[in-house]
């Protein structure tokens, strides 16, 4: 079964254009499932014919017994379903044992976001006197102005940014490309960063194609972006639950709050499905309800 798993992971990477992070998550989830299947079979060799609905349900029950969160169980069940569908298409399985297998019901969590004033405080936090402070301001402004995922920001190359038009070409999930819009303040922050970036890159002798570099002249990583956001959150006293992705949530919520069309927001976020974007309409509706309940005399 290891070869069948390896083939599925290759399929995800090469044919589905899944990111390395996605492939790694599938691998970890399915390796755990295979370990459970082997233990449950008590030493018998794991063959495709032994992948039964009963075995898969036993795996789900075990996940519940181990105390995993509903989101984790849902993700792992989804990984098994996807693998079984692939095995059926390949002819390895005659019937899909995962048909009808459903993860636990999960109440949709509303995305956490910052108010416009809090975003302004966070974006103003980096010092303007140091190259890294200038970089950090450009990072935060770009994340919020364009609604980028962190991986899209760290993967951004100089040749993909047009400062004259205020456009950047970013590569999102599934390696799909889209145009991201950069507002005036983000453009100004980027120009200030690019003016000092070259000196930092040359000083380290490791000039990069990346827009954003670390202090060693290498491409900035997602982990580094997380750390710098955490640092400035602490400085201005904002909710510690905030992450770089919160700026993307804030971008979408503020657009809708100010009258943007949901289809336009979908395109700007790079969502393949409108249903993914619609979670932000729930956020704005929730805020309206809260305001109504606080202000209306008969609420």
Regions found by a protein language model. Give the residues of each.
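Conserved catalytic core of the tyrosine transesterase superfamily
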Residues: 1-299
């Amino acid at each position: 079964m290891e070869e069948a798993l390896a083939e599925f992971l290759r399929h995800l990477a090469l044919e589905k254009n899944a990111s390395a992070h996605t492939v790694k998550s599938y691998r970890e989830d399915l390796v755990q499932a295979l370990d459970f299947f082997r233990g449950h079979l008590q030493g018998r060799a794991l063959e495709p014919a032994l992948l039964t609905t009963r075995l898969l349900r036993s795996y789900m029950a075990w996940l519940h017994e181990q105390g995993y969160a509903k989101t984790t169980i849902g993700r792992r069940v989804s990984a098994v379903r996807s693998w079984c569908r692939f095995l059926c298409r390949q002819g390895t399985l005659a019937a899909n044992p995962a048909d009808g297998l459903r993860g636990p019901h999960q109440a949709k969590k509303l995305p956490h976001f910052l108010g416009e004033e809090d975003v302004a405080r966070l974006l103003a936090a980096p010092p303007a006197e140091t190259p890294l402070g200038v970089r950090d301001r450009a990072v935060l402004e770009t994340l919020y102005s364009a609604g980028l995922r962190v991986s899209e920001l760290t993967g951004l190359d100089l040749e993909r940014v047009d400062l004259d038009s205020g456009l950047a070409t970013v590569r999102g999930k599934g390696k799909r490309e889209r145009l991201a819009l950069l507002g005036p303040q983000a453009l100004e922050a980027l120009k200030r960063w690019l003016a000092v970036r070259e000196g930092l890159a040359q000083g380290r002798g490791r000039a990069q194609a990346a827009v954003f570099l670390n202090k060693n002249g290498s491409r900035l990583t997602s982990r580094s972006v997380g750390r710098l956001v955490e640092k400035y959150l602490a400085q201005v006293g904002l909710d510690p639950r905030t992450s770089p992705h919160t700026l993307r949530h804030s971008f979408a919520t503020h657009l809708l709050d100010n009258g943007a069309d949901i289809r336009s927001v979908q395109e700007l976020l790079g969502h393949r499905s409108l249903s993914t974007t619609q979670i932000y309409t729930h956020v704005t509706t929730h805020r309206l309800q809260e305001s109504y309940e606080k202000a209306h005399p008969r609420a």
